[in-house]
A protein has these predicted regions:
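Transmembrane helical elements of multi-pass membrane transporters/channels
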Residues: 1-16, 120, 154, 187-191, ...
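Transmembrane alpha-helical segments of multi-pass transport proteins
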Residues: 234, 345, 380-381, 394
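Generic alpha-helical transmembrane segments of integral inner-membrane proteins
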Residues: 6, 10, 14, 18, ...
């Protein structure tokens, strides 16, 4: 179950990665603006991701309880909510983003490019938010193989459109960073269309309750929000703090920002491996609790961590032995490659800490006690923000040292999550 999800997450991340690869040939400003715009967009997307993760917990629990006819109504009510949320965020972003970013981005060139990117990128909200619900459905019912196929279709469309729209190939005008944003949004529309067609053709509509799922059910949505509300806020704040990290780096200069964007894209590939296993652990734990097997929680976490390290450690060894060839995929500038190597080493070591922190945190979410997870995340992020302020904004160190803030966040979350799970306070939580 983990491997198809892992592959799909890696492929989906490669949408942002291909933006960085293509824009790295345009210049440092475009590369840095892509980083800021990408994380800004991701903060909005994480509201949907948080809601979808809560919906996934509920779907997985119903699947474990064998109450299959409750699954499709949960998914459809989630889609209704996602559409309303997408409209609200799109309107707010189009109006307020230029005003907000003008006051917090120092470089006029980076500001202009970031606004251009976001103007077109936010159109993808409508498609990506609905895709989150389809992903929650397939992960919740433990049928994740289709996610890989969907992600491949999305990636191929994104690569082709990036090439045409950024550089002006195939009869299209050269749109630069705006072209990258348009390509990403259109590829998400392709992904949604694929999900709709596949689900309508293959889903067991009677078993999962699709035939009567489209009636608006406010009481069901209210129950979903009681679980998903905490994960929504937690996910949004988590990435918003990551945006603050990028803003702190931007104040160090355009070159450190370009370095950080490259390292972020490499880091995100590794985090996708961790996230796939952690998400699977959360879904399995929710299924196990639904089936009355709470005792399996720690065994599931331990097995998941071993499998994660089995893939992660060889990748880290290769990355640390050969950082320059990996960096060359993002830029052809020798000076930018040289400036990024030390940051790669620090980032690589942080992923070893992120693996257990993500798995333990998702285990808490799998128990259904998302409020406890929210509190732990807020404490960890408060510590992380303090490190960003004092360690980056005040001290202005070399960009590689800035990446040690990831270690602090990971260790804090491990301590809190381990304490909570060992306390047994999660037992008996109803979903």
């Amino acid at each position: 179950m983990s491997y198809p999800l892992m592959i799909s997450l890696i492929i989906e991340h490669m949408i942002g990665l291909t933006d960085a690869v293509f824009l790295g040939r345009v210049g440092d400003v475009a590369l840095g603006a892509c980083a800021l715009g990408g994380v800004y967009y991701m903060a909005m997307f994480m509201l949907a991701f948080g809601f979808g993760f809560g919906a996934q917990i509920i779907i997985a629990r119903r699947n474990g309880e064998r109450r299959y006819n409750r699954i499709a109504p949960t998914m459809v009510q989630g889609c209704y909510f996602m559409l309303v949320l997408a409209v609200a965020l799109f309107a707010a972003s189009q109006y307020f983003s230029p005003i907000i970013l003008r006051d917090i981005i120092e470089s006029p060139q980076v500001y202009g490019a970031t606004v251009d990117y976001l103007h077109w990128r936010t159109y993808g909200i409508f498609f990506s938010f609905l895709c989150v619900m389809f992903r929650a459905y397939y992960v919740g019912i433990t049928q994740t193989k289709i996610l890989t196929v969907n992600s491949i279709v999305m990636l191929l469309s994104n690569v082709a459109l990036n090439y045409c729209l950024i550089f002006g190939k195939g009869g299209f005008p050269a749109a630069g960073i705006a072209g990258a944003a348009i390509a990403s949004s259109v590829s998400e529309a392709v992904s949604l269309l694929f999900f709709i067609i596949y689900t309508s053709m293959t889903a067991d509509k009677r078993k999962y309750g699709f035939r009567r799922a489209f009636t608006l059910r406010p009481h069901l949505l209210k129950g979903m929000l009681s679980i998903s509300g905490w994960t929504m806020v937690q996910s949004f704040i988590s990435v918003s703090i990551w945006f603050i990290f990028f803003l702190a780096i931007e104040h160090l200069g355009e070159r450190p920002l370009a370095v950080t964007n490259i390292v972020r894209n490499i880091s995100a590939l590794l985090i996708m491996v961790i996230s796939a296993f952690a998400t699977t652990a959360g879904a399995l734990i929710s299924n196990q609790i639904g089936a009355g097997e709470q005792r399996c929680l720690f065994k599931t976490c331990g097995m998941t961590l071993k499998l994660t390290y089995a893939i992660l450690i060889p990748l880290l060894i290769i990355l640390c032995l050969f950082p320059e060839p990996v960096l060359r995929a993002f830029t052809d500038s020798p000076s930018l490659i040289a400036a990024s190597v030390n940051s790669v080493y620090v980032m690589a070591s942080s992923t070893l800490i992120m693996a257990p922190s993500f798995i333990l945190f998702n285990a808490i979410s799998g128990t259904g006690n998302t409020k406890a997870g929210f509190i732990m995340e807020m404490i960890s992020l408060a510590v992380y923000t303090a490190v960003i302020y004092y360690g980056i904004i005040r001290l202005k160190p070399d960009v590689a040292l800035c990446w040690f803030s990831e270690h602090v966040y990971g260790v804090t979350l491990i301590i809190l999550a381990w304490w909570y799970l060992k306390s047994g306070k999660w037992r008996g939580k109803k979903v």
